[in-house]
Every structure is written in C-alpha cells, then in structure tokens.
Amino acid sequence: MLEKDKIYSFRLSDSSEIIAKVISTDSTSTTISNPFSLIPTPQGVQLLPAMMSADTGKNVTINTNNITMYVETNKDVIASYIQASTGIVTAPKGILKG
C-alpha cells in the first residue's frame, strides 16, 4: 500500500517511469505532487518534469489502474529528486568537519 508523503518510483501502463511524492491514494485514483520522468541520456539518467505544461504547485491525479509497479525510491535518486523539485541540495552523510 502506498504511504502518504513518501517518494515512490512508479512504472505506468505505457511503460514510462515517474518519481513523485504521494499525497493520497484509494482504489481508483492516486494523487501525487512534483512528478518527474526519468529520461536516459548519454550522460546518464536525467529527471525532467513529467508534465511540462502543468502548474508545478498543483497536485496531479492518476488512475490507480495505470500503475503497474511501484517501489520506494532509493536514497540517491531521492536526493536528486529533491534537488530537481525544490532546488535544495542535500549534504552527503558523514561526520561533520571544520
């Protein structure tokens, strides 16, 4: 079951993959915020807004039946997602020095 406020990677029925934060979910629809698509490039995978024309401050609702797979996103990708969606760069884990 999807949990509110967690970031997930979704595979949709058209084979696209998006990363988004879950706002709410039920048997018919899932509401997400800041959906980003994973786009393979020669330099590696890039995150691009999943809906270029959407108001980024608005949530997006998708039909739950169109989600074929989902998993909690790994920590490295979450850091990139947070940077792409908010501009905040998370510091690497480790002992503080200086």
Place the predicted regions along the sequence by residue.
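Conserved RNA-binding domains used in RNP assembly and mRNA/RNA metabolism
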Residues: M1-G98
